[in-house]
Regions:
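Hydrophobic h-region of N-terminal signal peptides that target proteins for export
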Residues: 6-16
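Short metal-coordination and nucleic-acid-contact micro-motifs, chiefly zinc-binding Cys/His arrays
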Residues: 28, 288, 292-298
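Short cysteine clusters
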Residues: 32-35, 299-303
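Beta-propeller blade termini and top-face loops
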Residues: 192, 197-199, 203-215, 245-284
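Solvent-exposed helix-loop boundary motif
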Residues: 15-98, 102-134, 146-151, 157-169, ...
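Primarily short, surface-exposed interaction patches in extracytoplasmic proteins
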Residues: 122-187, 201-248, 278, 308-311, ...
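Positively charged n-region of N-terminal signal peptides that target proteins for export
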Residues: 1-3
């Protein structure tokens, strides 16, 4: 019976005319386009197969007539089949090509390059449930209130919920009111600023070998305020790319241009400043393309993009937008905006009109071999610059957020979705091009993009997602559902994924009551192992912060590019050298060792122990669980906790010297004469908790 079903399904699939985007484009990209695509330097025999005109002009493809299409003859040749290297096309792939050609060889544009179309449905749950129905699946039940409260707080603010807000929600069940309180919390801006700073390749040092300190933290603070103030995303974009060119821009607006001053500066003696200025411009182009357009523009700096619509010439037309800034690869990192007597920050500044540089195409990307001069412009495959837009960075920024742009809203909506569900509707967040992964729910993506584009309201978008039944689902999974949808791409259950590095640390400190609420200002230096900065030869030292600064959010921790903060690095945080569109997620022994040995976690554990003993002396382990996860343990969890408690007590009674080791990094919490209030008496073996 199973084989009959498989055969019938396969027959049904073959009966349909192949779809160009789903079936043919990936096949051509994999087997043909490297030699017969848009890159004129790599093109063989003058043949293009990525466009209808290119493929039909040479009769490689004769629409409706596969027998006379040379492409079929070449890929099926008995002794010299194409492609000349690698595996030849399978019988199934040949059959797909044949059916597609006989069906008219219809080429369609890549989905991401077409403007979003408004679908019939108008809600997130409509599209999710429709897809589930196609696969004969049903949504999971709604998670309990405590779980939802913790999920939303960690997603929106990066820390567990505050006691008052949690208690109110658990009592009245008004989730919308609770979510609004999270948006009003200043910690919301800190959470989403950190996500944006990954894209901005933010760090507190210049990078490269010397990696000297630089002052750019006011840009970090600007991003926090922008999210808390719900600055419309189009203005958020324009200020970061071109506030210095925007009429009537304020000092705060100018700080926003730090986005592209986060590029690295090489101050080592003997380096060519122009070489590294050129590298910085390329970085700005690649970063802009990925952050706003989901495009790998950096691939076109040496040759025309092999797969996506950006020629070698067009790369340098974009280069011209960024080639007119006053910054260069200089130790002073000028231009610098003086804010106060003790604070300054790096900003962008356009060159005067009579100082403007000429931009030339660099042969094979080598700045030492300049070719033809080009003027600033945008890729021809996309919409032109807005009619009244200037041909500078300001006009380019306006082009990015134009209603005609098919990508910016989609890419941005997808990024926000990804941070709430662990994966985007388009999994390849960094690549919406032809080599990327297509959307799991294309109509839903278009709906969210079109609605977001109306007013570019980030909080409204996030609220819409977290208020959906899809977001509220329980993350419990049955073996059958895990088998049918292991990656949860159909969203039949709530998301379950590891917290970001900063949230892992911050939620531990918050649960223990240690996390400082202090915002803004210069970076701080919580404890890190001695000697970590010895890899940097510039003589800088890590001066461990004292008091409240020791317990500030990880967002404020000093970031050195060549020597990342160890506990953040172990949980996959980037070092700021390049734009990080999405972090990898690993599970390694180093993470367990970090949570067991890093003083931040040890001090959090000590404070939590004290709270648990004080509030529930008869069952402190259960109270610990409730303080961290905001719910009582299940029977199975309680049994495991009880076993762990007994094992720990036995170990401490037999090895009292471990007490001193556990407390050695504590700065202000506990001293050895107070240990008896936290653990069973190691000398008498008493089991009761004091």
């Amino acid at each position: 019976m199973r084989w009959i079903l498989h055969i019938s399904l396969a027959a049904g699939a073959f009966a349909q005319t192949p779809d160009f985007q789903r079936d043919i484009r990936p096949l051509l990209a994999k087997k043909c386009v490297a030699c017969h695509g848009p890159d004129e330097q790599a093109r063989q025999a003058g043949l293009r197969l990525d466009t209808f005109d290119g493929a039909t002009k040479a009769r490689a493809i004769v629409p409706g007539d596969s027998e006379n299409s040379r492409l079929l003859a070449r890929v099926t040749h008995a002794t010299r089949p194409m492609p000349p290297t690698g595996p030849r096309l399978t019988d199934t792939e040949v059959s797909l090509l044949r059916k597609w050609i006989d069906g008219g060889a219809v080429y369609t544009n890549h989905w991401a390059y077409e403007k979003p179309k408004r679908p019939a449905g108008n809600s997130i749950d409509y599209f999710i449930q429709a897809k589930l129905a196609e696969h004969r699946l049903t949504p999971s039940k709604e998670a309990d209130r405590a779980t939802l409260a913790r999920r939303a707080a960690l997603d929106l603010t990066g820390v567990p919920p505050e006691a008052s807000g949690l208690a109110a929600y658990l009592k009245d069940g008004n989730f919308e009111k609770y979510v609004d309180s999270l948006f009003a919390n200043p910690q919301y801006g800190e959470r989403w600023a950190k996500i944006w700073l990954d894209l901005a390749r933010y760090a507190d040092t210049q990078g490269y070998e010397k990696d000297n300190k630089r002052s750019i933290w006011p840009y970090r603070d600007w991003v926090i305020r922008a999210f808390n103030d719900n600055l419309p995303f189009d203005k958020f974009t324009i200020l970061q790319l071109a506030a210095d060119l925007t009429p009537d821009s304020s000092i705060d607006d100018l700080i926003a241009t730090g986005f592209h001053r986060n590029t690295m500066t090489n101050t080592e003696g003997g380096t060519d400043d122009e070489e590294y200025r050129d590298i910085a411009i390329r970085d700005r182009i690649a970063t802009t393309g990925q952050v706003w357009m989901g495009q790998t523009w950096g691939c076109a700096q040496c040759h025309t993009h092999r797969y996506d619509p950006l020629t070698h010439k067009e790369f340098y037309q974009i280069y011209a937008f960024f080639n007119q800034t006053a910054d260069d690869d200089h130790p002073s990192d000028r231009p610098v905006l003086k804010l106060t007597s003790s604070a300054s920050t790096l900003v962008m500044k356009e060159l005067a009109e009579d100082k403007q540089r000429k931009t030339r195409i660099y042969d094979r990307g080598n700045y030492l071999t300049p070719g033809d001069e080009v003027k600033a412009g945008v890729p021809a495959a996309f919409h032109p610059l807005p009619a009244k837009a200037p041909k500078n960075r300001l006009g380019f920024a306006q082009w990015l957020v134009s209603p005609e742009n098919p990508l910016t809203a989609r890419v941005t909506v997808n990024r926000f979705w990804s941070r709430l569900f662990g994966t985007g509707l388009v999994e390849s967040e960094e690549d919406f091009g032809t080599q990327g992964i297509g959307p799991t729910h294309a109509e839903l993506l278009d709906l969210l993009a079109l609605d977001f584009q109306k007013d570019w309201d980030v909080k409204k978008l996030l609220k819409r997602i977290v208020m959906s039944a899809t977001y509220k689902q329980s993350s419990d999974v049955t073996p059958e559902l895990l088998r049918l949808d292991p990656a949860n791409k159909l969203y039949a259950r709530g998301a379950r994924f590891r917290l970001d590095a900063e949230v892992v640390r911050d939620q531990a400190l918050a649960a223990a009551g240690l996390l400082s609420g202090k915002q803004f200002g210069p970076p701080v230096m919580p404890w890190q192992p001695d000697g970590v900065w010895l890899v940097v030869y510039n003589g800088d030292n890590w001066a461990t912060s004292k008091g409240e600064d020791r317990y500030r959010r990880a967002l404020y921790t000093f970031m050195r590019r060549t020597s990342a903060y160890p506990s953040m690095m172990n949980f996959d945080a980037p070092n700021g050298e390049t734009c990080t569109i999405r972090r990898i997620r690993t599970n390694t022994p180093l993470q367990a060792l970090t949570s067991l040995n890093d003083p931040a976690f040890m001090e959090a554990a000590q404070r939590l122990a004290g709270k648990a003993v004080k509030e529930s002396p008869q069952d402190p382990a259960k109270r610990l669980f409730e303080l961290v996860l905001l719910r009582p343990p299940t029977k199975a969890e309680a049994a495991r906790l009880s076993l762990l408690q007994r094992q720990t007590e036995a170990e401490l009674r037999t090895q009292p010297e471990n007490v001193s080791k556990l407390l050695r990094y504590s700065e202000v919490l506990y001293t050895e004469d107070r240990v008896a209030t936290l653990i069973p008496d190691a000398r008498t073996g008493a089991r009761e908790w004091r």
